[in-house]
């Protein structure tokens, strides 16, 4: 196959097929390193996968990582002589990475360094879904106390498995709302092949809808992810290709966490190009039905908050709507939207002083916060573009 630029033609098979940006912004505080050690482990896992495959083929991989709150670096992973090395491309100072302009700059630097037919983004950080970081300033007290308690200890001193929610409500100065990320991608002019969130609570319908015009696919968890993050050594080969195999990536995640010492994890691959269609069906349902709050405790919860925020979307709609035609229409559209999903029998949460396990009896691959009575959800959900698109 040939493509042309001006009067020149070039064989597509000879050009860079894909560039992945591994984006790891600051996740701690001024005195605490947050997930930085875990990020270094993740990068080692990615490089292990690259060595196993004997290189990157016709793809390239760049890393943006914050070493402190105000110092970040852009590297390229180079494979040579059966090993990987990191070549420094640029040093950034300040915290512009929390802004749309800063995100656009990083993406533009990535494109200028490693032009490709396709671009993808892997985001490693804390995650609280679609919620607005400013709404967490004084809530929840227990989670803040937990963050302060655990940060005094090294990770190895803690007998319980940490998750990537840890610390995310401690300091909002380096937080980024999902709208800001979407706007940054939009400003860069890129449309991404996929975004993988190595963060807690990011496979929700509000996030997927917000990202629908900047990425084709979203890969994320509905629930908390262990602090070790995605099993990149196992998943990389499915994603670092011109045509990613989302089923294979989901299966690799599920296999890893099924056999992990804390065998808990959920994951979904979501086709964001279907989100407008899903919103249209949801609006039709909302026009005819109002949720019976007496059924709230019967919906599958996929988080560990004392007052839940993230409910299984399929289960919620099944309890909201009683029209067989609309239910079938919704389920058919949901199946087109969530192209692959997997879950262990239980999820794990470490938001408060003692971790808890929760049974999963049904799993659709997406969560929704419409029925939530959580303070943070109530402060923000009607501001989301998903809510505006699905409610009169």
Write out the residue ranges for each language-model feature:
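Structural recognition of the beta-strand scaffold that forms the well-ordered cores
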Residues: 19-23, 60-65, 120-123, 193-197, ...
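C-terminal motif of bacterial Sec signal peptides marking the signal peptidase cleavage site
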Residues: 2-4
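Terminal, contiguous helix-loop blocks that mediate binding/assembly
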Residues: 13, 148-392
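Solvent-exposed loop/turn segments at secondary-structure junctions
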Residues: 26-30, 67-71, 95, 125-131, ...
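Solvent-exposed, charged interface segments at domain starts and junctions
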Residues: 36-59, 125, 140-153, 275-293
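N-terminal extension/subdomain marker
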Residues: 6-117
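Surface-exposed loop and adjacent secondary-structure segments within mature catalytic domains
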Residues: 66-87, 123-169
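Short, solvent-exposed loop/turn and secondary-structure capping segments
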Residues: 32-33, 74-75, 131-136, 207-208, ...
């Amino acid at each position: 196959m040939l493509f042309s630029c001006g009067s020149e033609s070039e064989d597509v098979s000879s050009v860079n097929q894909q560039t992945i940006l591994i984006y790891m912004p600051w996740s701690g505080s001024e005195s605490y390193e947050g997930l930085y050690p875990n990020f270094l482990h993740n990068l080692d896992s990615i490089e292990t996968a690259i060595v196993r495959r004997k290189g990157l083929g016709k793809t390239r991989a760049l890393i943006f990582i914050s070493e402190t709150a105000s110092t970040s670096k852009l590297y390229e992973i180079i494979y040579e002589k059966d090993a990987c090395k990191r070549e420094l491309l640029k040093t950034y100072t300040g915290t512009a990475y929390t802004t749309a302009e800063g995100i656009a700059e990083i993406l533009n630097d990535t494109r200028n360094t490693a032009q490709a037919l396709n671009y993808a983004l892997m985001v490693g950080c804390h995650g609280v879904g679609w919620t607005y970081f400013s709404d967490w300033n004084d809530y929840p007290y227990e989670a803040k106390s937990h963050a302060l308690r655990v940060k005094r200890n090294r990770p190895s001193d803690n007998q319980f498995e940490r998750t990537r929610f840890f610390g995310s409500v401690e300091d909002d100065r380096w937080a980024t709302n999902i709208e800001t990320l979407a706007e940054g991608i939009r400003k860069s002019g890129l449309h991404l092949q996929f975004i993988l969130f190595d963060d807690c609570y990011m496979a929700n319908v509000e996030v997927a809808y917000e990202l629908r015009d900047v990425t084709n696919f979203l890969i994320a968890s509905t629930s908390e992810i262990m602090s070790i993050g995605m099993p990149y050594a196992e998943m990389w080969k499915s994603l670092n290709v011109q045509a990613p195999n989302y089923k294979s990536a989901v299966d690799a995640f599920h296999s890893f966490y099924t056999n992990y010492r804390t065998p808990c994890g959920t994951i979904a691959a979501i086709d964001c190009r279907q989100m407008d269609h899903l919103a249209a069906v949801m609006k039709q349902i909302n026009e005819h039905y109002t949720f019976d709050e007496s059924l709230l405790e019967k919906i599958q919860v996929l988080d560990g908050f004392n007052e839940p925020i993230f409910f299984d979307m399929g289960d919620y709609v099944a309890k909201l709507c009683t029209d067989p035609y609309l239910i079938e229409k919704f389920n058919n559209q949901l199946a087109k939207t969530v192209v692959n999903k997997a879950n262990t029998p239980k999820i794990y949460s470490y938001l408060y002083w003692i971790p808890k396990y929760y049974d999963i009896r049904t799993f659709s691959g997406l969560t929704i916060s419409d029925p939530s009575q959580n303070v943070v959800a109530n402060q923000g959900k009607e501001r989301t573009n998903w809510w505006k698109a699905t409610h009169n």
